[in-house]
Amino acid sequence: MQQINRRHFFKVIGIASVGAMSLNAKETPQNNSTKPTYKTASIIDIGRCDGCKDLGTPKCVQACQNKNLPNFPNPISNIPYYFPRKIYEDYSKDRDNISRLTPYNWTYIENLILDTPQGQQEVFIPRRCMHCDDPTCQKICPFGVISKDENGAVSIDDTFCFGGAKCRDVCPWGIPQRQAGVGIYLKIAPKLAGGGAMYKCDSCADLLAKNQAPACETSCPKGAITFGKRDEIFKKAQEITESYKQKAQMQGTYIYGDTQNGGTSTLYVSPIPFEILDNALNQKYSFTKEKPQKVGIPHLNLEVKNFVSSDSALIKSVLLAPVVGAIAGGIAIAKSNKGDKNAK
C-alpha cells in the first residue's frame, strides 16, 4: 500500500469536498439502453472438472493463491473492533482454508453428491467472482474503488477500500470477502470508519490486459476453464449446452451466468441441470429463501435479479451522503497522484 498521511488525506478531502459533494448531489445511476460490450468472457465446464481429487489442493486453487500471494492482506496484530460492535472479520489465522471464499482464497471447488435417475453422481464446481456485466458492487461502492475494465474483469483497489462491505451486501452471490486490520481506514479513522478491505477474484486482469490466460485456466489439467473472446466464448458455451442437454434428455437449465444478475462474463455449463445442482447445494448447507447462502459460499439460484439497477433509491442513499462525496473526491485525487499501481 502506498504510504498515506492522515493529515494529507484530510487536506485532499477538504480540496475535493466542494466539487465532489455538488457532483454527487447531481449524479444519478445511469440507465443505459444499450448493453456494454466487453472483450473477454470465460467458460467453466462442470462436466470436465474432477476437483483434482488426488491432490490436497486443486490446481486452479493453488495457482490462484500463488499468483495473488503478493496481493493478500497482512493485517496488524492488534485489530480494532468495528465500532460500535465488538467484532471484526479476521481470516489471517485461517489462510489455508480452501473450502470457501476468503480474503486469502479467491476461488474454491464446491463438491456435491447428487441423486439422479442414473444413480448417485459426484460433481465439482469451481466458484469465484462472476464478473457481472452490470456489477452491483461497482454501483454501490461509495468510494469508487471498484472498476470494470474492457475485458470485463471487475477489480477492487484494496489500497483505498474502507472495508464497509456494501459490495458484499449487494452482490447476489456475496463474493467479496473482508479482512480487518488492513487498509486506508487504519490511517484515517481506525475507530470510526470502515472495517478493513475487501478482496476477491479479479480475473487476473493484469494477464488479460497482456492477452495472457489467467492462472486458473493455465493450471487446469482437464481444460475445465476457458477464457477467450466474448462472442466466441458465448457461442462455444451454447454449443456445449446443447450437447449436454441432448445427452441428459432431461428438462432443465444447462447454462448459468448468461442471464443471472443481468448477465455476466462467466458462463457455467453442466451435464446436469442447474435446478438439480441448486437443490443439492441448498440441502448441503441448509440454505433457505430467507438465508439463500452463507458467507463465502455462493448459491446457484437460477433467478438472480440486479436489484441495484431496479432500486435507484438504494444507490442514492449511499452515494449522496456529503461525507461520502468528500471522501470519494479525496480518493479520486489521491489515486490520480498515485497512478495506476498495476501499470508499474
Regions found by a protein language model. Name each.
Residues 1-344:
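Non-ligating segments of multi-cofactor redox enzymes
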